């Protein structure tokens, strides 16, 4: 492993220094993208002047800038991306994730990770289990068979934040700036690559991370916002393929989804009983009710904002518009990290 790139959001200068100290123990070359620092803010403003900047802060924006920095280095051919809140992390996860694209005897350009979502003897992964899968099945019943829907449904865990790819993928991939990132990446793989260039791999026997609140009272937070962003990502992709949507279709989709999701709640209840896991049916059905409501919210946002462009421009386009940008990005990040390799004292390490 040659480079480690860490994207850091919502951090002031003190928090950035804490992050630098924390990651200083890594023996590999590593840089932190301080997205809220003056250097990267200045570069983002330059992109905004050309209508090329991500419209909002978010996971997709963070990942996009990390991709740009990796491109600017020019010395990396296989790249793996994973979340930083994994509680069950070990080196085997990373090795299994990157191996399919790093092995020169394979011809894969993209690899998606998957894993069981059980922790503390509870069934996890509510958004994937209770939103994505029943939503895809409901869409097929509502608008008919679509190859794209079948493609997304073929992935064991479509919302996994762990994937790897060859360097050539980075220049022309268009990703959303919000929580639709994982679906957006799969959509780009569907559009740009043949099926035999894509794979998925089991990367962990057990996986757990920081859990988000469902946020029943605030659609702008937690799993509620995540669900809206994911629904919008799927709808926009289908619309880009010529599918027509209206409020009446969204009402039918909501009703169909609700029935599908309740059936899945019963399936997971039986799975949990058989495997001696805990599952709260009330919490499960509360999530389903929220996701059903958010289908209508996402549909209204989609219909009310037909010109909204959630995808960030490709790095190829940025490079064409501002040829010096990637080099300036590299310089800015190096400047922010200029003290990163200065070994902190034992006192600094805590």
For the regions a protein language model found, what residue spans apply to each?
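Conserved donor-nucleotide/metal-binding helix-loop-beta segment in metal-dependent transferases, i.e.
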Residues: 91-112
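Active-site-proximal specificity loops/subdomain of glycosyltransferases
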Residues: 22-73
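Short beta-strand-to-loop element that shapes/binds the nucleotide-sugar donor at the catalytic cleft/hinge
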Residues: 109-126
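Conserved catalytic loops of nucleotide-sugar-dependent glycosyltransferases that act on lipid-linked
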Residues: 122-228
């Amino acid at each position: 492993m040659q480079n480690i790139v860490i994207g850091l959001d919502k951090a002031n200068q003190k928090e950035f220094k804490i992050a630098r100290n924390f990651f200083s123990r890594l023996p590999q070359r590593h840089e932190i993208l301080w997205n809220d620092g003056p250097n990267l803010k200045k570069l983002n403003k330059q992109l905004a002047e050309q209508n090329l900047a991500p419209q909002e802060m978010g996971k997709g924006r963070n990942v996009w800038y990390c991709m740009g920095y990796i491109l600017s280095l020019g010395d990396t051919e296989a790249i793996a991306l994973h979340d930083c809140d994994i509680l069950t992390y070990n080196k085997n996860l990373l090795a299994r994730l990157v191996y399919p694209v790093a092995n020169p005897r394979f011809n894969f350009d993209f690899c998606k990770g998957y894993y069981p979502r059980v922790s503390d003897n509870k069934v996890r992964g509510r958004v994937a289990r209770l939103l994505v899968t029943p939503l895809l099945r409901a869409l097929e019943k509502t608008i008919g068979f679509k190859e794209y829907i079948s493609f997304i449904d073929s992935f064991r865990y479509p919302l996994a934040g762990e994937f790897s790819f060859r360097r050539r993928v980075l220049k022309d991939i268009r990703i959303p700036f919000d929580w639709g990132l994982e679906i957006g990446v799969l959509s780009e793989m569907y559009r740009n690559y043949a099926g035999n260039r894509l794979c998925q791999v089991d990367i962990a026997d057990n996986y757990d991370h920081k859990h988000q609140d469902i946020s029943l009272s605030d659609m702008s937070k937690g799993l509620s916002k995540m669900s809206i962003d994911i629904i919008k990502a799927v709808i926009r992709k289908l619309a880009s393929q010529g599918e027509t949507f209206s409020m009446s279709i969204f009402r039918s989709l909501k009703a169909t989804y609700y029935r599908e999701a309740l059936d899945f709640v019963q399936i997971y209840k039986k799975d949990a009983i058989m495997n001696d896991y805990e599952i709260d049916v009330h919490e499960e059905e509360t999530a389903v009710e929220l996701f059903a409501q958010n289908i209508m919210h996402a549909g209204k946002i989609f219909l009310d904002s037909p010109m909204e462009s959630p995808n960030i421009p490709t790095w190829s386009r940025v490079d064409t518009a501002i040829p010096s940008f990637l080099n300036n990005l590299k310089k800015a990040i190096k400047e922010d990290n200029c003290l990163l390799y200065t070994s902190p004292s034992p006192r600094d390490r805590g």
